[in-house]
Amino acid sequence: MKLTFRWYGPKDCIPLNYIKQIPGMTGVVTAVYDVPVGEVWECDKIAALKAMCDKHGLEMEVIESVPVHEDIKLGKPTRDRLIANYAQNIRNLGKYGVKCICYNFMPVFDWFRTNLYYKHADGATSLSYSEADFNKLDKRNLRLPGWDESYTPEQLNGLLADYDGMTHEQLFGNLVYFLNGIMPACDETGINMAI
């Protein structure tokens, strides 16, 4: 097992030289953040990210994440092109020593945290989720702390409507279709996928 730390790229408020100071730290878990979901991560962007890590003596073996486009999750006709792009991302990342890609297949919302600064009894802070706080939110006009507001309210409502009526079995079938499409690239590169 290797000790790694989440790093949100060059704009992260925690610089790599701080991460390197953590005893036993061997690498970072990061991603390319300036490419639209579904597009190919060009090798020059990956190389630049890896060079930043290398400069600080940190490995870049884990990527979290290469986002899965909603059209793939929904099983739309555009999914085959998007899956091909995802497979190319796997191949491109493999050229730079990446061994694991973390991803999710959750519809619309990657994650929910209702508080980015939950204060514990010892004074430490952490991210937290409260079901009670979540249930108070207007699901059609969500604004959560630290959330990437990728969608306008109209786009969000459209996506939610697209998922209306989708069964668990249909979503799972779309996940299997996606995995069947990307596994050849994983086999070629030796990259593991972590959901």
Give the residues covered by each predicted segment.
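Structural motif
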Residues: I22-P23, Y96
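Glycine-rich, positively charged N-terminal anion/phosphate-binding segment
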Residues: I22, V40-E61
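Short, acidic/polar
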Residues: G9-Q21, R81-R91
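Glycine-rich, proline-tolerant flexible connector loops at the mouths of alpha/beta enzymes
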Residues: A31-A47, F109-W111
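Extreme N-terminal starter segment of soluble prokaryotic enzymes
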Residues: M1-L3
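Active-site beta-loop-alpha junctions enriched in small/polar residues
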Residues: R6-P10, T30-V35, S65-V68, F105-V108, ...
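Active-site acidic/histidine proton-transfer and metal-coordination neighborhood
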Residues: I72-I195
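Conserved, mostly hydrophobic/aromatic
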Residues: I19, V28-T30, C53, L93, ...
